[in-house]
UniProtKB/Swiss-Prot annotation:
Basic and acidic residues composition bias: residue spans: 221-235
Official protein name in the record: Rab effector Noc2
Record note on domains: The N-terminus of the RabBD domain is necessary and sufficient for interaction with RAB27A.
Keywords recorded for this protein, A-Z: Cytoplasm, Cytoplasmic vesicle, Exocytosis, Membrane, Metal-binding, Phosphoprotein, Zinc, Zinc-finger
Coarse class of the protein's main subcellular location: cytoplasm
Residue ranges with Low complexity bias: 257-269
Record-listed Zn(2+) 1 binding positions: 95, 98, 120, 123
Modified residues (Phosphoserine): 248
Role, per record: Rab GTPase effector involved in the late steps of regulated exocytosis, both in endocrine and exocrine cells.
Length: 292
């Protein structure tokens, strides 16, 4: 064995000194199998496009899972912060969460172990009921412990990276933290009982929101059907004296002006021919003669 290591043959291997090793390290040369590898051999060992695509898919899937985990932790943190913002009491004489008065005249109180605040029994949670001395926690501290347990903060000694849910309504990722969609206020149909104002006019009920044509037709019909001598509820003159439709009904249908002018001219011609002077001149009618 000694001859093998310290032999005098020319082909025997000798361990290089530190200087040579440092020089070979700078020149990237050595006794490795990859030292004298050619460029063609290196290209032949490169990844194929299918392998690159598979690796990229694995990386993208890991990134998506990481984002989902951050969103899940963000929802837990948002819920905890919402509970902290909604406190109503001071934790001394009032319940920290609901603000109920504590003491002899109020409800019984318990002492939270973590935040050292007083809460009522409804807002407190008994953490260790099996022990002789019960351990009480408020809902905020209990939720904080739950966040540390479910987010892995107990392992990392702190809350990991998270993404808070969006504040825009309807854009939150989780339905429990998504605010209710704001629906546009629908215009309620106007009730006919409340929107219509009925007035007693001319013996019948007339709606104020009816069309003007229906009002005119109904009023003209009432004028025709109302007997003469009945007084108008809005005026003092009887219906027969108001020059309304009663006289027109008594006198019958009116004739056109052309027909009247024609009949008057014919009547005048007949009268003129009967009383005309034989000499051709018009004859004047004399008035009643007085006593001679």
């Amino acid at each position: 064995m000694a001859d093998t290591i310290f032999g005098s043959g020319c082909d025997q291997w000798v361990c290089p000194n530190d200087r040579q090793l440092a020089l070979r390290a700078k020149l990237h040369t050595g006794w490795s199998v990859h030292t004298y590898q050619t460029e063609k051999q290196r290209k032949s060992q490169s990844l194929s496009p299918a392998e690159v695509e598979a690796i990229l898919q694995v990386i993208q899937r890991a990134e998506r899972l990481d984002i989902l985990e951050q969103q899940r932790v963000g929802r837990l943190v948002e819920r905890l912060e919402t509970m902290r913002r909604n406190v109503m009491g001071n934790g001394l004489s009032q319940c920290l969460l609901c603000g109920e008065v504590l003491g002899f005249l109020g409800s019984s109180s318990v002492f939270c172990k973590d935040c050292r605040k007083k809460v009522c029994t409804k807002c407190g949670i008994e953490a260790s009921p099996s022990q002789k001395r019960p351990l009480w926690l408020c809902k905020i501290c209990s939720e904080q412990r739950e966040v540390w347990k479910r987010s892995g903060a107990w392992f990392y000694k702190g809350i990991p990276k998270f993404i808070l849910p969006l504040k825009i309504p309807g854009q939150a990722d989780h339905p429990s933290f998504r605010p209710l969609p704001v629906e546009p206020a629908e215009q309620e149909p106007r009730s006919t009982e409340t929107s219509r104002v009925y007035t007693w006019a001319r013996g019948r009920v007339v709606s104020s929101d009816s069309d003007s044509d229906s009002d005119l037709s109904s009023s003209s019909l009432d004028d025709r059907l109302r007997p003469a001598g009945v007084r108008d509820p809005k005026g003092n003159k009887p219906w027969g004296e108001s020059g309304g439709s009663v006289e027109s009904l008594k006198m019958g249908p009116t004739r056109p002006a052309s027909c009247l002018s024609g009949s008057q001219s014919s009547l005048a011609s007949e009268t003129g021919t009967g009383s005309a002077d034989p000499q051709g001149g018009p004859r004047t009618l004399a008035g009643p003669r007085g006593p001679r």
